[in-house]
Amino acid sequence: MLTATKSIPEHYLQMTQEELKNHIQSIKDTLGDRLFMPTHHYQKDEVVQFADITGDSLELARICKANTQAEYFVFNGVHFMAETADILTDDHQDIYLPDLSAGCSMADMANIQQALHSYDVLTQHYHLDILPLTYVNSTAAIKKFVGEHGGSCVTSGNAKSVVKWALQQGKTILFLPDQHLGRNTAYDLGVPLEHMAVWDPIKKQLDYDGRHDQLRIVLWKGHCSVHEKFHKAHIEICLLYTSDAADDSLRV
């Protein structure tokens, strides 16, 4: 992925919305299939209007991989999404992220230096045989770290099967960076909460009072800042207002 950054030229800042729209469309028309603009479905309408395809982050990365014609990918999303697309596309294809400061709060909660330190402490101080897993919403450096230590990437859709596989390896899982996905998935697979611990990358310590030989999964203290705002009461209110709906529509 190209990481050079430049300030926006003044003449673009002086353009009206209509002028910008026409200019972008002119470039798209000129480059044709050489340019591909995957766009995350959380983007604003003013960006989505130029999208060649919209979808979630993993879907867009797979679509980029399948596109062998495009030379330039302008990925309208956040940093880890563009990195994932860059991993999957060919070397001669360039990935551009319009705003290099566009980040995911959860992905930013686990950097490679923190991951390496946690691995050293867990293996050398606590003498744990660690198998790392990372949610796909993580940096390329974290994905590389996980792969180098025999682990795997996890999606929301395959989390249960991947965590089940990891548990069968007889090692202690280090799950980054979404502690809630790791905890809920492991719990659904029968791992008791008392056999789970939380690693705090800021305090650089393990939050666990049990026996280390019973520890099945270490959860990275990370989370989605948006999901943290949802509470049980929100669901109860939604169910209250949809109480007249058909039973099938209420099954979550």
Locate the predicted segments by residue:
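Loop-centered beta-sheet repeat module
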Residues: 162-209
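Metallocofactor- and cofactor-centric catalytic cores in central/energy metabolism, strongly enriched
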Residues: 2-90, 94-134, 142-156, 190-193, ...
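Short, surface-exposed amphipathic charged segments that create phosphate/polyanion-binding patches used
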Residues: 109-117, 165-173, 231-237
